[in-house]
A protein has these predicted regions:
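Multi-pass alpha-helical transporter architecture, strongest
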Residues: 38-41, 121-133, 305, 334-366
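Central cavity-lining transmembrane alpha-helices of secondary-active solute carriers
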Residues: 1-12, 205-220
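Cytoplasmic helix-loop-helix junction between adjacent transmembrane helices
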Residues: 52-90
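C-terminal ends and interior cores of transmembrane alpha-helices
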Residues: 29-43, 239-254
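Short amphipathic helix-loop junctions that connect adjacent transmembrane helices
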Residues: 181-203
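A membrane-interface helix-boundary motif in multi-pass transporters
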Residues: 104-120, 317-343
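Juxtamembrane intracellular "pre-TM" segments in multi-pass secondary transporters
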Residues: 132-167, 189-194
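Hydrophobic core of transmembrane alpha-helices in multi-pass small-molecule transporters
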Residues: 31-34, 44-64, 170-171, 258-274
Length: 366
């Protein structure tokens, strides 16, 4: 719900009235307060309200972070495609560090993880105010009804290429939600039958391979985007999603099938980064300067908002069909269906998204 409403809404606020870095700082502070409250409340309804407030504050910071980062890179006279990924990789490293601290300290079983997250959010909020100013764009001369209502970013859908890209971002967002919702339950299902298996004993390490993979593939984005362009990079992402789900379908907790689980974690980095990070770079190039934050908000809404909702419901139907008494009885069939879905939308994307890329080769001659 938060991803569906807030990124686009906050994007409008940033484009029209408030500096993006200041808005991001305030949102992180709101998130910190809500997380502190969630850590100590004893009433479950109050806990849900606190977490909802946190998500409403946090989700738009993802799209705002793109806007602020691209603004800083542009001001420094750098290249977004070349210089943004080495910055973005630190977000994934932070995710890995937090996950390991959470697991090693035992915070995952108490309110320690919420307190740690609140402290990090408060520090991040303070840091945001030290970032280069990212002011609202100058108002357009002819402000029509769409502009007055804050719907300028919908102009993105008038362009065929951008509209197709956003449509398939929505469809890929559904695939992302599948792995977010059912990746961990799938691995946990091995506990009942193979409690001593490597994949069960070291499930945290196994899962963290996905984030390690992310750090590597993020750094590869400049090469692939400059050499092959967004269309081929997105097609590679679709192929990686097919492999991600396909490896899950044939993977197992012990013996040789463990290799496929490891490969699934590794290929996830390519599947996620080549879609999410590369997609934000493409949108930043396609969107006019006057709607830079709103455009990233629309991208976030399509992927983490609409895509997550549809992906959650759709995957839930598949899982329910292959379950008995709430227990999934045929995980391989589920993952095969998800792999087929990724394959089909990948083919459709290749056929409908028209983009001619001019490879950048200057840097290679230095």
């Amino acid at each position: 719900i938060a991803s569906l409403i807030m990124p686009a809404l906050i994007g409008v606020v940033s484009d029209k009235w408030v500096n993006a870095e200041r808005l991001m700082g305030v949102l992180h502070w709101v998130g910190a307060i809500s997380l502190f409250c969630a850590a100590f409340v004893t009433d479950y309804d109050l806990f849900k309200i606190a977490m909802l407030v946190n998500m409403l504050a946090y989700m738009p910071t993802l799209s705002l972070s793109y806007t602020v980062a691209y603004n800083a890179i542009d001001k420094a006279g750098l290249d977004r495609i070349k210089d943004y990924p080495p910055v973005r990789v630190w977000g994934t490293i932070g995710f890995i560090v937090a996950m390991w601290i959470d697991n090693l300290t035992g915070f995952s079983s108490n309110n320690g993880q919420l307190i740690m997250a609140a402290c990090a959010s408060a520090a991040m909020g303070l840091y945001c105010f030290t970032l280069p100013a990212c002011p609202p764009a100058k108002a357009m001369k002819n402000n029509g009804l769409m502009s007055v209502l804050g719907l300028d970013a919908l102009v993105l859908f008038k362009n065929y290429r951008t509209a197709v890209f956003l449509l398939f971002s929505f469809l890929l967002g559904a695939a992302l939600q599948v792995t977010n919702m059912y990746g961990v339950p799938f691995l946990d299902s091995f506990k009942a039958t193979h409690p001593e298996a490597w994949a069960v004993k070291y499930s945290v390490i196994l899962s963290s391979l996905s984030q390690v993979s992310e750090t590597l593939f993020i750094l590869a984005i400049p090469f692939f985007m400059s050499r092959y362009g967004i269309k081929r990079v997105m097609i590679i992402s679709f192929m990686a999603w097919v492999l991600r789900f396909g490896f899950f379908a044939i993977g197992g907790p012990e013996g040789f099938p463990v290799v496929f689980l490891v490969l699934s974690m590794i290929v996830y980095g390519m599947a996620f980064d080549f879609f999410n990070v590369s997609g934000s770079l493409f949108i930043s190039d396609e969107a006019p300067a006057s709607i830079k934050a709103s455009a990233q908000g629309i991208f976030m809404m399509m992927t983490n908002g609409l895509g997550s909702i549809v992906g959650g419901y759709g995957a839930g139907l598949v899982i329910a069909y292959h379950s008995e008494n709430g227990v999934v009885t045929d995980w391989p069939a589920c993952w095969t269906i998800f792999a087929a879905y990724a394959c089909v939308i990948g083919i459709l994307f290749a056929l409908t998204f028209h983009y001619k890329h001019q490879a950048k080769v200057k840097a290679e001659k230095v």
